[in-house]
Design a protein with these regions (language model features):
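A short local structural element in Rossmann-fold oxidoreductases
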Residues: 20-21, 106
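Catalytic metal-binding/acid-base residues of hydrolase active sites
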Residues: 16, 61-63, 145, 171
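Active-site-adjacent betaalpha module
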Residues: 1-9, 43-51, 68, 73-214
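Surface-exposed, active-site-proximal loop segments in enzymatic domains
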Residues: 22-29, 70-71, 157
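Acidic-leg catalytic submotif of subtilisin-like serine proteases
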Residues: 9-19
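Short beta-strand segments at enzyme active-site cores
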Residues: 12, 53-60, 66, 167
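A short alpha/beta connector and helix-capping loop motif
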Residues: 6-8, 24-48, 52-55
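Catalytic P-loop NTPase motifs of RecA-like helicase/translocase cores
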Residues: 19-20, 174
Length: 214
């Protein structure tokens, strides 16, 4: 694979405190997994920014809980202690600390899309408008959860004819390792390429070598 900085962007899906800061998260990833995915994503973002790749953070944010409870499944499970998404009606309400992007992952010059209301980061947001304006044809997806928002966004990106790379080291799921791995396999079979950080950086270096040989 060859990746070119001018036509590639990272779409960081819900890498905010609502999932990744156990002290305030309403739908938390396990603490040890938070630290790992943050460290891996921060390293990848820093190296990609250095070669000119744009980082776009997409953040779930609701004006009020009724915007969440209008989904019948979420309304049904919000107070079920057996469900991973219990308490979802309190998740990332406007003004809450959960809506803040993890500081280690944000840098000046990054772009932010805050309209996300459902699993698909394209739905009712200006994400596609932004990608097209930037001349992007390839997206590198990172974020939480592999099993929901990353998965749905990957399928929608391929439906809109973007080339999809999933940064396998920089995604994770509150649904556990087995479901996380299944989601990666499903995306690999259907919509795109799960690559490690090392493989992603290698793909950019390969494109640079091709350019020098012309």
């Amino acid at each position: 694979m060859r990746l070119q900085a001018h036509s590639t962007a990272v779409v960081a899906v819900d890498m905010h405190r609502g999932h990744l800061d156990p002290s305030v998260a309403t739908l938390p990833l396990a603490p040890e997994r938070c630290a790992l995915v943050i460290a891996r994503a921060a390293d990848l973002f820093q190296k990609l920014r250095a070669i000119g790749v744009r980082i776009i953070h997409v953040v779930t944010e609701y004006r009020e809980s009724e915007e969440i409870s209008s989904n019948p499944f979420w309304k049904a499970i919000h107070d079920d202690p057996a469900k991973a998404r219990k308490g979802i009606l309190r998740h990332n309400l406007a003004g809450s600390k959960g809506t803040e992007i993890i500081p280690e992952l944000y840098a000046e010059g990054d772009l932010v899309v805050r309209e996300k209301k459902r699993y698909n980061a394209f739905y009712a947001t200006d994400l596609e408008f932004l990608l097209r304006r930037l001349g992007v044809d390839t997206v590198i997806l990172t974020g939480i959860n592999t099993t929901t928002c990353v998965l749905c966004t990957a399928f929608e990106a391929t439906n809109r004819d973007f080339r999809v790379v999933i940064a396998a080291d920089a995604v994770d799921s509150m649904d556990g390792e087995e479901m996380h791995r299944f989601a990666l396999r499903l995306m690999e079979a259907s919509v795109g390429w799960p690559l490690s950080n090392q493989e992603i950086l290698k793909a950019f270096r390969a494109a640079d070598r091709d350019h020098l040989l012309r």
